[in-house]
Amino acid sequence: MLKLTKALFCAAAVSMAGLAQAADPIVIKFAHVVADNTPKGQGALMFQKMVAADPQLKDKVKVEVFPNSSLFGDGKEMEALLLGDVQMLAPSLAKFEHYTKQIQIFDLPFLFDDLASVDRFQQGPQGKALLTSMEDKGIRGLAYWHNGLKQLSANKKVILPKDARGLKFRVQASSVLEEQFKAVRANPRKMSFAEVYQGLQTGTVNGTENTWSNYESQKVNEVQPFFTETNHGLIDYMVITNARFWNGLPEDVRGKLQQIIDEVTVEVNKQAEALNQTARQKIIDAKTSQIDPLTAEQREEWRKAMRPVWDKFSDQIGADLIKAAEASNKAS
């Protein structure tokens, strides 16, 4: 009798533990490397808030946001995602060349005229196909988030391609971006985002490329006296998740999370340009740096100098994909 009672007690304990475990919310750790007041930072917080407020998800899913490389840095976050240590990231599109060469298209200099052109390509069939192109590597793309168009900064005035010659520019870990600077006889240096300020301050690098919001949020204007408004390239992000984690979610939860991501994406992309313009004005108001816009003729010189990079990566990316991206500039 005692043995039976003990067995029943153990069974009940296991059952109660199972119920408690079933009631535990699904935790989504969303890590990123930038500040909260950037387009990506705002998007992550918006996603967290909307999940917490959703009647269907609020007791089932908990989102935790880790900004400013506070959980994993630039070089470690992708590995952490694949190991399941984080569930969501939004890396720069420059970070995916090891998983699919086609995504290098977003790093090609002077490919897109403006963010409207980027939108047309990303929301078209070719852009959407890229989101699911890495599932066999364990990565599922959920959306594209804008940051914005890139500008140059340096410790000297850089107006024409010849002015960049010999300067050391920080780049993300991207073969295309390395070749972009080599095309103007500058020296690219790979460096994580968190190291950029110190690298510029100490002279490890002389300049960099980024968006206004990233420049201002990291106070790069304190260590860079000159900015050149080139709009030469794109910094966008892909919101990604671990494919096994995503496919293992209950179907109703997965569908609702995707719906919220889609809603957040609309807002992030709507706000990105406004955030960049506000950041640009803050840099002007700080009176620490000079911003030089380019004339059409000067910009064309940069375009011609960097255009050979397209040919170098055409086979890897796909000539048809590049043509589709170019066509987005002409769409009405």
Regions found by a protein language model. Give the residues of each.
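N-terminal secretory/targeting leader peptides
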Residues: 2, 23-117, 126-128, 132-332
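Repetitive helical segments and hydrophobic/amphipathic motifs
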Residues: 12-15
